[in-house]
């Protein structure tokens, strides 16, 4: 089991239930967003965002559509650039690199690839290679990107597919797998790169309830058995409450409110948070 996150400042962990939790003070965050702004034309999707995540912490990100949740993950994975600010992963800047005489330069592609290798991401769509079997999908990146020997990559891929409950599907192609099975292959593929941080972007949104449960069970197991830091964008409120160490409610490109699951779900302090959770309950 992952040990409880004990290196947050105690002031953030001793608040009564009816007090909104401030941003925790984390001495050595594994992920850090510092004044990050991202714009699409005149629309600001991330607005001076600040967020630190502790090693091994599981953070659920909730909020209405268009609030910046998925963009947060996409800029962390460098699928999108940022307009302002700084992002760090495991003590290294993802957006800048050291230059001469202490100068900070915009990170080049080589530097970005090195830092980004510490991150794995699973998307809403499975994005599997349709012409490759489940096993080949998991083997491909370690061999081509990390230079892992094929035999070693195959052994690791087999272990991961067993772990996600697909030990009997090695040679099946994506078209022969259910949506839940494809998503579990995608999780195994991300884990094959041995990331320190895992990102999940609405990974159950395209699945029916039964298949959704299959995927959430795998993520639950990852959280309990592996020392991975996880950031999950989700509308699965029950799962987020059970799974997360911290819940961040996004609104208009900022963290509008954050706290423990009990604080956010039982006694949110901000009216916009209360309205969102009420709408979710009514929809369900």
Question: Where do the model's predicted regions map?
Answer:
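C-terminal boundary and immediately downstream tail of ABC-type ATPase nucleotide-binding domains
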Residues: 2-4, 8-9, 251, 258, ...
